[in-house]
Amino acid sequence: MSGIKTYIISNKDRRPDRYADVVEQFSNKTEFDVQITQCVFLDDNRRYGLWLSMMNCIADAKKNAYEKCILVEDDAYFTDYYNENTFLQYVNYCESVGYDILHGGIYGTSNPIRNAYNKGLWDIAWCWSTHFIVVYNKCYDKLLNYKFELHSDVADGVLNKLGLKRAVMYPFMVLQKDYGYTDITFHTVGHMAEMLRDTNKVFEVNLRTLN
């Protein structure tokens, strides 16, 4: 059986370190059918460039009638919690019950709700992060038809606005390597770790209330 169509959005010429790292991450994982996709680089509006890159992938997935696809940014890496069988179980479950998007990991959310049938999945109303998302075909058109606000929108903010049915795996199976910048922002090294600590605390608090 072939793997899930997986689009890795990267720019080999501008970011050879990130390109090499992310290719290595997927090198031995046959559950993914990897396609390297050239990112749309707009130096004056990187937010829009990322969105266009993502929509190019979604358009290709729709054209090829893929029931689902995975979008990956080139700073993504698999954590020690990643397990192929568990990952595929989550992906198939979310597809069977009508989710729009499944996140491999996030930075920032509030009030996640643990799934009653899959305790490693949590429903979320909003989050920050698009570095690894499973996108199901039921929301392809909603994403493709969205009119991106050039002066205010960011990709993860758009997903928050659209009211999609979303879940995240926790513990997180895929996170972002901190290069000191993302596709749309520059920041101090260590900022990602701080955001991750804060996000983990949100889940830890919710776990304590369940125990």
Question: What function would you assign to each model-found segment?
Answer:
Residues 1-72, 76-211:
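An acidic/histidine-cluster motif and surrounding catalytic segment
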